[in-house]
Amino acid sequence: MELNSLLLLLEAAEYLERRDREAEHGYASMLPFDGDFARKKTKTAGLVRKGPNNRSSHNELEKHRRAKLRLYLEQLKQLGPLGPDSTRHTTLSLLKRAKMHIKKLEEQDRRALSIKEQLQREHRFLKRRLEQLSVQSVERVRTDSTGSAVSTDDSEQEVDIEGMEFGPGELDSAGSSSDADDHYSLQSSGCSDSSYGHPCRRPGCPGLS
């Protein structure tokens, strides 16, 4: 929208400068055809013809239009960079420079939009990657906790076996087996001692033969 308004101002400035140059040589120039401008000009001409003093009304309208144009140009000078020779700018050169500046801003806007889209894609990728790493971390923690629970159960079973207590019957059976072992060891030692002292009188002892 601003570019269209600027183009209209550019055409108007070109027309004014061309008309000023042609007025110096004694001939006039036609303004490029524009539907809106033609309708406004027709309406203005009708108002001028209806007035009592056509020439003065036309001069007032022209003065008002030029004042608005100067106001727009001053605003344009404040918005765009003019360079070191800003005081020597004509209306046409000012509008051309403003047009170039608008194109430069549009190009910067396109580049910024492209960078923004690229950053948004990278943000989505990193977000998905973070979610994947979070899921893997939770699964790893769950696996480690399960393995530690299994090792804890095994150690508890070993402790129960080592700390097992025997009842009275189990102790008697264990004691009788140990007494039999002691009795057998005494017999063996008695037979071995008989070779140095008295002969062994137990049946089955080799000293009785």
Curated annotation (Swiss-Prot):
Gene3D superfamilies: Helix-loop-helix DNA-binding domain. Keywords: DNA-binding, Nucleus, Repressor, Transcription, Transcription regulation. Residues 185-195 have a biased composition (Polar residues). Residues 137-209 are annotated as: Disordered. Pfam families: HLH. Residues 53-105 form the bHLH domain. Disulfide bonds: none annotated. One of its GO terms (biological process) is negative regulation of transcription by RNA polymerase II. Residues 6-23 are annotated as: Interaction with SIN3A and SIN3B. GO terms for cellular component: RNA polymerase II transcription regulator complex. CDD domains: bHLHzip_Mad4 (cd18929). It is found in: Nucleus. PANTHER family: MAX DIMERIZATION PROTEIN 4 (PTHR11969:SF4), MAX DIMERIZATION, MAD (PTHR11969). Transcriptional repressor. Binds with MAX to form a sequence-specific DNA-binding protein complex which recognizes the core sequence 5'-CAC[GA]TG-3'. Antagonizes MYC transcriptional activity by competing for MAX and suppresses MYC dependent cell transformation. This is Max dimerization protein 4. It comes from Mus musculus. The gene is Mxd4.
